[in-house]
Amino acid sequence: MPLPKIATPTYELVLPSTGKNIKYRPFLVKEEKVLVIALESEDNKQITNAIKAVLKACVQTKGVRVETLPTFDIEYLFLNIRGKSVGEQLEVNIICPDDEETQVPVSIDLDEIQVEKSEEHSNQIKLDTNLMMEMKYPSLEQFIKSNFDFNDTNQMDQSFQLIASCIDKIYSDEEVWATADCTKKEVNEFLESMNSAQFKEIEKFFETMPKLKHDIKVTNPKTGVESDVVLEGLASFFA
């Protein structure tokens, strides 16, 4: 006689980027093993790929392509799946800002962690009095490939390619140019023709993108100093 199947509950959440409602299940022991092995490797690419594989297995709504979701959707989705799988209290070690060395364990309720959307953020960039550009959010795949970092000069070329891939269209009052209909060379040359002020507006798009964020207070047991700490991005919640 075959062993019985264990029923797995399903839950729902709303994707921050689109407002779309999706169903998901907790990850199973076999999927948790994949995550543990990846985390132990301390390799960012392996960890990211493990998260992506687990999300593909856990998302139950048809038509959701995990690899194309914006990074903040990925982070929010994974955090919720993790909460339903192993507990909704997350233990994080925080380094006290006043001495930058003392670590304090803090328990965070996962329900309190949300994706923050900046009022300054817009995917519409004005280039001049007649020309506008519409951006699209980078996917997890694009971040893996580019190792995106504006401040790392060694990565500027890869960052440039990421920016080019995130331009959805360029338009004026009379005409629209979809980058899907352009060559990479054409898009790159268009970017290179910008002045510094125009390019900074593109940087602002990435810097103000929605992100996981949570504010906490920590007290240094050695000094008694209380500090405000801001956790941003998925990595901060697994410190």
Which residues does each PLM region occupy?
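Long C-terminal interaction/binding lobes of large macromolecular proteins
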Residues: 1-239
